[in-house]
Each structure stands twice: as structure tokens, then as C-alpha cells.
């Protein structure tokens, strides 16, 4: 979206250079990441966004990085209705949530569908760091039996509501628990594990082979520099995993990208 183009002549050129053209749209809410040097132009920026994005009713500015177990940021209302509860539509699925209180990344929609279309009816799938359900609900809709672990009690509530909303409540077991407790809680093995790991949670991959049947598939997400990837592949192979696919799926910081790994337990 061409946010900078909308503000030419409104925000001075030297300040406009500090504006990121990227922002999240979740349902009818837009979330910006404004440089402090743009504080004097918040109203103009938010108004331009509301004018150009007819589906957006509320604009927030993220004023802290992700923090706490809920992986949420403090949000500052810039314009609009001020309601942080919304419904996000993605490939025919509806996700209810409060963006001020739960984590959701609207830019992973393609990845969620890429993974979901690989799921076969009758599979047993484990989803860790499940959030409000975007990685759990599509596999259930394809006929999988899903166990979804999420540490945030509030996110679990939204996940259960979203499972009902999307007609898959009978195929999803929602468990409010730390992902690292999975082996103790779930004394069973799965056909597939879907793990959109938060930053700094890479050690979870060590426990995944023990949760899978032979031939089971892991979809794992991590944050790395490109030069780290070959070493990472070797470490996964040492765990008894064959890397089937490795792809970059978004930049998150200078020289740091989100990487998707599809791996098979051999």
C-alpha cells in the first residue's frame, strides 16, 4: 500500500523519508509503526490512511515492541472508532480477536494456506503457539483432528470461538498450556506438527521429532540471517529430520528474515 504517496505535500519530504510504507491491516483495523520524528504528523497520516482504505475504521500506532507472554504491543489510538476487537477474513475463514490483547500476523495468510492444503482428512495434527487459530482451523476444515496449544488464556478463548464460528469445534482440542509442556501433557504422536515459533523459541524444535510418527511432517518457522540457514539445516538433519523445503517468508529486521521449513521425520 502506497502510504508515502498519499502524504506527499502533507508531510515534509525530510520527515516523510522516515515513514515506513508497511502497515498491518487486521479486519477493519490498521496498525502503523511510526518513527518518533513523525509524532507531529500522526493526525495527517491516520486521516490519509482512513481516506484511502475504505475497509479500515480504526487506526492504531504500535508504540512498544512485542512483549510478555501474550506477544502483544501497546497500541495508541490515532483515528477512528477506537474498538480493538475485529473480525479478520482470510481465505474464507473468520477470525475474531482483540488486537490489543492477542497476537496475530495478517501477513502469514499465504503460509497458512500453503500448509493447510498439504493436510489430509483423518490426520492428527499438533499446532503449537496456536494464537487465535489461523494455523489450526484450516487443517481442521480439511478433516484433520487438531490439538492446539496456546499459553495465553485470552487467545484460547478466541480460538475456541473461532473454531465454533468456522464449524470445526468438534475437530479441535484447545489446550491452554506452554508449548514446552507438550510431551508431558500429550502422551501420543501426531502425523503433522505446525509450529509458528515466536522469536527466540528455536529450542522447541528439539522436542518435535519425539511428538511425530515416522514419516510425520513438521512445518517450522524461525527468524534467521541467510548465512545461518545451511548450519540450521544440518542441525535439523542431526535430529533425524529431512528438510523438504526451506523458504524465506518475510523480512522482520535488517538482514533477518522469517524462514519456513517443511521437514519429514525419517
Model regions: which residues?
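SAM-dependent transferase fold signal centered on methyltransferase-like domains
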Residues: 1-266
Amino acid at each position: 500500500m502506497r502510504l508515502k504517496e498519499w502524504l506527499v505535500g502533507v508531510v515534509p519530504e525530510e520527515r516523510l523519508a522516515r515513514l515506513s510504507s508497511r502497515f498491518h491491516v487486521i479486519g477493519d483495523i490498521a496498525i502503523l509503526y511510526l518513527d518518533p520524528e513523525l509524532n507531529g504528523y500522526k493526525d495527517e497520516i491516520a486521516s490519509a490512511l482512513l481516506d484511502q482504505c475504505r475497509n479500515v475504521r480504526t487506526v492504531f500506532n504500535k508504540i512498544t515492541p512485542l512483549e510478555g507472554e501474550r506477544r502483544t504491543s501497546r497500541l495508541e489510538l490515532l483515528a477512528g472508532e477506537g474498538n480493538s476487537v475485529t473480525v479478520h477474513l482470510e481465505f474464507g475463514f473468520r477470525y475474531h480477536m482483540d488486537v490489543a490483547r492477542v497476537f496475530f500476523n495478517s501477513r502469514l495468510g499465504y503460509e497458512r494456506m500453503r500448509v493447510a492444503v498439504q493436510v489430509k482428512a483423518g490426520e492428527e495434527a499438533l499446532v503449537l503457539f496456536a494464537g487465535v487459530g489461523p494455523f489450526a482451523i484450516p487443517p481442521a476444515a480439511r478433516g484433520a483432528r487438531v490439538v492446539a496449544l496456546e499459553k495465553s488464556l485470552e487467545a484460547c478463548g478466541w480460538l475456541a470461538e473461532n473454531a465454533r464460528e468456522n464449524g470445526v469445534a468438534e475437530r479441535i482440542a484447545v489446550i491452554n498450556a506452554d508449548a514446552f509442556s507438550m510431551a508431558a501433557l500429550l502422551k501420543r504422536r501426531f502425523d503433522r506438527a505446525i509450529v509458528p515459533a515466536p522469536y527466540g523459541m528455536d529450542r522447541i524444535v528439539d522436542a518435535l521429532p519425539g511428538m511425530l510418527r515416522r514419516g510425520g511432517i513438521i512445518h517450522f518457522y524461525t527468524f534467521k540471517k541467510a548465512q545461518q540457514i545451511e548450519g540450521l539445516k544440518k542441525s535439523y538433519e542431526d535430529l533425524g529430520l529431512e528438510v523438504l523445503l526451506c523458504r524465506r517468508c518475510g523480512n522482520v529486521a535488517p538482514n533477518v528474515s522469517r524462514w519456513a521449513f517443511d521437514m519429514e521425520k525419517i
